[in-house]
Each structure stands twice: as structure tokens, then as C-alpha cells.
Curated annotation (Swiss-Prot):
PROSITE patterns: MFS, SUGAR_TRANSPORT_1, SUGAR_TRANSPORT_2. Belongs to the major facilitator superfamily. Sugar transporter (TC 2.A.1.1) family. Trehalose transporter subfamily. The keyword Cytoplasm does not apply. This is Facilitated trehalose transporter Tret1-1. Low-capacity facilitative transporter for trehalose. Does not transport maltose, sucrose or lactose. Mediates the bidirectional transfer of trehalose. Responsible for the transport of trehalose synthesized in the fat body and the incorporation of trehalose into other tissues that require a carbon source, thereby regulating trehalose levels in the hemolymph. Coiled coil: none annotated. Pfam families: Sugar_tr. Disulfide bonds: none annotated. Keywords: Cell membrane, Glycoprotein, Membrane, Phosphoprotein, Sugar transport, Transmembrane, Transmembrane helix, Transport. Residues 134-143 have a biased composition (Basic and acidic residues). The chain crosses the membrane at residues 393-413, 441-461, 474-494, 498-518, 529-549, 553-573, 637-657, 674-694, 701-721, 741-761, 768-788, 802-822.
Amino acid sequence: MSGRDNRGAGGGGGGHQPLSNAMGKLKEKLTRVGDELGYHRVESNLSTSNTATSLDTILPEDPFLFPQVSPQRHPQNIVRTQLLLEDEPPLSFRPLLEDDDINEPPTQQQQRTPLRASGSLELTPLPPPPTSLEIREHRDRQQRGAQGDDLQRSKQSLKGSRVSFERRDTGNSNTNSNKAAESSDEDSFEEKRTGFQQQKATSVDHKGILKDLKHILANDNRRQFQAKKHVSLDVKGTRFLQDLLKESSSEEEFHKTRREFQGRKHQSLDPRVTFKLDKVLQGSSTDSDEEGEDAEHKRLIHRPKDITKPVIIDLKDLESESDEDFLTSRQHFQQQRSISTDSRKSRRLYEMDEMGNKRGENIRHAVPFVRQITEDGKPKLEVYRPTTNPIYIWTQVLAALSVSLGSLVVGFVSAYTSPALVSMTDRNITSFEVTQDAGSWVGGIMPLAALAGGITGGPLIEYLGRRNTILATAVPFIVSSLLIACAVNVAMVLCGRFLAGFCVGIASLSLPVYLGETVQPEVRGTLGLLPTAFGNIGILLCFVAGSFMNWSMLAFLGAALPVPFLILMFLIPETPRWFVGRGLEERARKALKWLRGKEADVEPELKGLMRSQADADRQASRNTMLELLKLNNLKPLSISLGLMFFQQFSGINAVIFYTVQIFKDAGSTIDGNLCTIIVGIVNFLATFIGIVLIDRAGRKILLYVSDIAMVLTLFVLGGFFYCKANGPDVSHLGWLPLTCFVIYILGFSLGFGPIPWLMMGEILPAKIRGSAASVATAFNWFCTFVVTKTFQDLTVAMGAHGAFWLFGAICFVGLFFVIIYVPETQGKTLEDIERKMMGRVRRMSSVANIKPLSFNM
């Protein structure tokens, strides 16, 4: 040791060169020697981490090449590196841990003056580097083993690392041991390094380390989020936590008890674990005197801790009945208790929890705003949002029934000409003459007036309100029927029909808008078909009464029908959406309370209406009619207009207006009046079939079935009339026209009859709903006028078969229109439909098989 010290002293003290030159040469020499030996110096300031996780890198131990390096934390976070280039006993290493005492006095071997890596360099006499012979021997050992690769990887990973080495007391101070000892040391090092890597999972790959760290941090954040933000959808559990918060003496006590409760209460989504939990819960029992919620909470808290451990159970060993019950329960659990770690979803869950009433009905009857988890662990993209309130059905039925009586009047007025024209053209009954041309105007003026009423109705429902506009049509309906009943000439009949048609246009516009804004999405399809059903009742009533009454008595009956409609309209409120649009928040709240029930929490729905109205106001234009031409508004308007076009050009009103005449021309062996009654009954019953199917099969499926049925029957009916006019005798097929008419009416009433009106109130945006509905209604009645006014001319020019074939071809084109353009609106709120139609949400697959919620009758 003394010889080496003398050489070091002599080398460091010779000459009078400046100290800086000596420092530079010594540093350069040490660098060159260190690089030759495979050693990488730590020269940058390495600040210590104040977190609990550090990146520890393994440096292979070599008692010859790698001297002891012991980083110590400087008060200024400077790592001091100590280089010892003298023969020492074998070294071992370990990562520098956070709990190490950095103020512990250094050992005797560590009491050396360090080289500072922070820009300044303190020089002390250092031992010379190993001789070339020693270096050569070490390189030979490198070539014999695979240690060289480990050294290179360690060299690359040393940057930025914090490594601490400590001396291993082996009891042997002689470093020049034999080769067997060296081999033993190398094997010992390999074993320790392998064990360290297995225990600490420390990778020399920085990307792997960062990936593992991110995974650890993500799991830690998730656990913290679930512990702090997790809100239980279980009503009893949530209420218990709220009571626990009040009773806890400190926040720590509350969080501790809550974590214990949540850890044992919430079940795993793993089916095997969930099934095991269910079995354990079913097997648990308590004393008979421990009943009620307190006993339930006590059982939740004092469950065995190992209850949540995964237990592998083969579902094949279970009974099939238990298996089905389990799968049903698990699906229910996933829908009602699946918690998303997304903060927005969790905030919505928290809001839903606040909505719950004392009995928790809101939570139990709701599907939450969550990304539901499928069996393969992937989230569904569709988020289905029904109401969070139980459906209070009676008030909504009363509202739908009230406006549907107006639809009954509309149906009666529309079908009036079919039985009335037969007696009106009879000079033995009528005191004035009605020519064929005048009769066509009696049938055609009503749709023309409805066109004007549809245009006028749009502004009226915006300024007067939906309810008041519907109510305003009741008295004119009575006046129009009295004008016809007391008519002494054709002019009075035409005036009465024009006034009735004008009211029909307004009513047909406002009825679907009112229902669309008052009933809940879960029953909108069912109750939305009530106006169509009552309209068909009005048609049937007109056909049946027309077979026994002349045109004047039939008009008096028409004057009596609006009376109950007028009375019931005074009992229902205005739509909450219209109140919100006028800034009448309190009246909107009262209307919602009336519609949803006094015990219902209407604040969330009211807030949704206000947000929707605010969006509509921000995007509103002074010229609403020009707003219709914007691209995002043109799409829903075009769909609505297309449905109205294909509805009317299916020829339905030509069939209804001239049913008796068509059966007479067909030469049917069945009485014409009886045929009209049969058609009316089928039309009425088919609507109720549609009511049952529309919220189960969906809108588009019913449109497909409706269109195909009409195409087939119209082509067959056209073939019958063609054969009758040009072909063989078809008198033995007198039943065929009635059969085709029944199937045709059945198909129309299932789909293209009610759905275009229903979807008009669904797909049109709120800010243009009044004007757009006005345009769609006017267009519908324009098409009705064209079809009814030109039907007789078509039969003369093309023959009856040509007219029916034309209607069938149009229906065939309508099938492709429905397939390509018409969206499915089943089970969606108006806000969701509007966002999708306006292009503000991405296209997502619909949630299948979600049934409507149970009713509180």
C-alpha cells in the first residue's frame, strides 16, 4: 500500500504546472482507462426522487474491474462518486432504498475524498490503474463466458441510475485468489443477480421499466379512484354509507369502514367469482331477531375477509336452472352496478344516486349511464339512457287519449266522402244536384285545405302552444260539420269541407308534436300510435254509420264528436318543452309533475330540456324558414318529407275515399258498404297490432313489413283489374279484391300509416320542429290532394290496373328509401335523436333487446 501511495504522490506533486492542467490530464487518463475497462462514469447531477418508486439498474459486480461506487445524497442533490482502484475484497451491491439512512457515518472503506461530478473536482492521491497483464487476464475471462453481454447492457443502462455498493465481509483480504475462487465469485454473482431480478423485477430495458411503472401507477390511481369516488348503485348500501358518515367521529374512521364495506359488498364481474359470492350470501344466516336494514348492514360489514377471493368453479357442474338464474342475475348486476372509471360517467352515476327517492325506485328502475361490460370484457359503445323515474302511466295515457280524440275527428272527416257521396248524388235524398266533377271537389278540397292548415299550424304551435293550438280546432270542427249538415247547395258543402280540412291540417301537425314532447321514451312508441288508432276508429265509425245514415245525418254525427275532445283538452297541461322555450321554468316543472307523477324527481329532465333549449337558442336564426335549408337541418326534414311522400303515394287515401266505388267497379259479389266496414275494422285492428310491436320490433322493421305487403297486394290487385278488363272471366275471383284490400290495409296500418307521423315528432330538431313539421304536414296533404283529385282521372287514362301498378312501383322505391335513409329511433330520447341527426355524435351500434320499464298503474 505504501509503494502505491508514494507513486501516487510523486505523480501528483511533480513540477510547477498549474493545478488546472494537472486536473485535466488526470481526468483524461482516468477516463481513458475507465473506458478501456468498460466502466462508465456518472458525471451529471443526479437528483434523487422523492417518490416511493425508483428506477434501479443492475451493475455486474467484478472485484477487479469495478471498484466500489457509493453514491451519497448531497444536500444540493449532487451525487458524489467514489472511485477506488486498489485491490479490495470482493464486493456486493444493492439498490439505494428510500428508507436508507443517508446520514449514517461512512465505513472505514468509504472514508475517502470523492470526485465531484458537478463541475468541480477534488484531487486526492489515487492508486494507479491495473497493469496491462491484469487487464489481459480479465479480458480472457470475459471471452470465456457470457458476462461481456451483461457488462455492455449494464453500461448502457447506467446513465441516470442510482446504485449503491457495500463491502461484503468474506473474511479474506487477499484479492489475488486462485481461478477457482474467481469462478466461485462469478457464480455467486450470477446467482445473486438472477435472484435480485426475480425479486425486484428490475429490467435493464428502460422502456420496460417505464411500462411497468405506468401500469403500477394506473392500478394505484384506479384503486384510489374507486376508494374515493366510487358511488354504489345499491340503495341500501349507499344509504348505509351516508349514515356511516354522520356517525363517524373522524374522516379516517369513515374511510376505513367504507373501504371495508365496499371491498366486501361489491361483487366481481368474473362469473365464477360472482357465483361463489352469491352462494356464500345465500348460505349466510342471522338470528331471527336481527331483521331490517340494520341486520343487513351488519352482515355486510362482518363477512369473512376471504369471501372475495377468486374461487374457480366449473359452471358445467352446476344445475342448468341455477346456471340460468346466475346468468340473469349477472346481467342485471352488470347493468345496474357496473361502475365506469370515467369521471364523467361516475359523475352521472352520482347524480343518479342523488335523484333516488326514499324507496330507491329511481335507481331500481333505471339503466345507468355506464359503458356496460360484455362477457368478453369489452365495453359496449352504445350508451342507452332511459328515464331515471318510474313510469307513472295514467297521466300520460290521459294526455294521449285527449289528443287522440282529435285524431278520431280527423279520421271521421277524412272518410266522410266515401259513404256520403253515394247518398249525396242521389236526387231522391238530396235537394240539390251534385255532379261528378262537384263530387270530386267535395272529396279533393279537404286535402287542399289541409295543406293550408299545415302551413299555418307551424307558427301557431310556436306562439300559441301545442295544447292551445289543438284546442282551437275543436270549435271549427263543430261549425264545419254543421255547415255540411244544413247545406242547401254544393257551395255550403264545399265551405264546410274546406273549414274541416283546414282544421285537419292543423291537428295532424300538432298532435304528434304534443305527444312527442309529453310522453317518456319508453312508452312514446305505444302511446304515439294512439292518435292513429283513434283515427282508424273514426274511419270505421264513419263507414258503419254511413251504411245506415244519409250524408246530412252523418254530418250531424260528425258535429257531436268534437265535444268530448273539447272537454278533455281542458284537463291536460301544455308541453313542458314549450314552457321552457318561453322561459316559464316553474310552469314547466308543474307540467312535468303532472305528467310524471307528484312523487317523481323531474329536475334532471327539466335541466335536460333547458340545456336542449339553450342549444337551440344559440343556433337559432331570425328567419326560421331559411334555417330549414341548412345542411344539418335538411337531412331530418328530407327524411320526414320522404316518408310523407311514400305514405300518400301508396294510394291509401284514394282507397279510403273511393272504397265503395272501387268495389263496385271490381264487380265483387260482396256488398260495397259491407266491404268498407270490413276494411275499416281491419284498419282499426291493425293499428293495435302496431302498438304492440312498435316498441319491440322497432320502426324500421315495421316499415319493411308494411312496404312489402303493400307492394304485393297492389300488384295483385292491378293484375285482377287487368284480367277483368282484357283477359278471361274473373267473376269466380270476386273475393280477391276484398282479400287484397284487407292485406293492403293491414300492412299500411302496421307501418306507413302511423310511423311517418310518429317520426316527424322524433327526428325534427327542436329549434325548427314547428316550422319543419308545418312543411312536412303541408307536403303530406298536398300529396293527398294530388292522389285523391287525380285518382279518377288516372283510372280513366291508365285503367284501374295502371293506377294500382303505379302505386305499387312507388311503394317498391319507398322500400329502398327506408333501408338507406330512415334511422331507427326506438328507445331514444329526443335529445339523443337530435344529436345523431345533427351529426354531433359518432355512429354507434344500438343496444339490442332492452325492454321498456315496468309501469306503475
